[in-house]
């Protein structure tokens, strides 16, 4: 019985290395396949990350372009409205000049007449509306400023120093700080 057991054991020990070798070979093959799969997965992951990065950069550029176009359109729209207001204001200046002339003539004839008072109220209302929309008259104090005044003649004046404004011949206007029309003035020249 002992011999039989030894034979059986010998028989198993001879088979074990062969099956063990097959199992090891199979495991090595699986390990290689797993390593190849891991490498392929790494390559796929790298490729995916690269493509994702490219697409993300494209998205950021397109988004930035979109925002720039949006801002430019808003600015263009705003400028178009500004230009429209400025154009209307320029078209109104002769009407304002006519009302000022009519008021001046009416006041010279009779300061207390209904016409004079009506023209005065109309001018006040007109200036209120213009001011609400950023249109205002240019002040013509004593100092001459070539940015706001246009000297169209020089006159002798005992009351004013050289270069000072003597008389406003036509009112000037500005729109949101920008000159629409300079004030036409005469300045003192006492040489």
Curated annotation (Swiss-Prot):
Gene3D superfamilies: 3.90.20.20, Head domain of nucleotide exchange factor GrpE
Protein name: Protein GrpE
Keyword Transcription regulation assigned: no
Recorded name of the encoding gene: grpE
Residue stretches of biased makeup (Basic and acidic residues): 1-19
Species for this entry: Helicobacter pylori (strain G27)
Keyword flag Cytoplasm: yes
One Gene Ontology term of the molecular function aspect: protein-folding chaperone binding
Protein family: Belongs to the GrpE family.
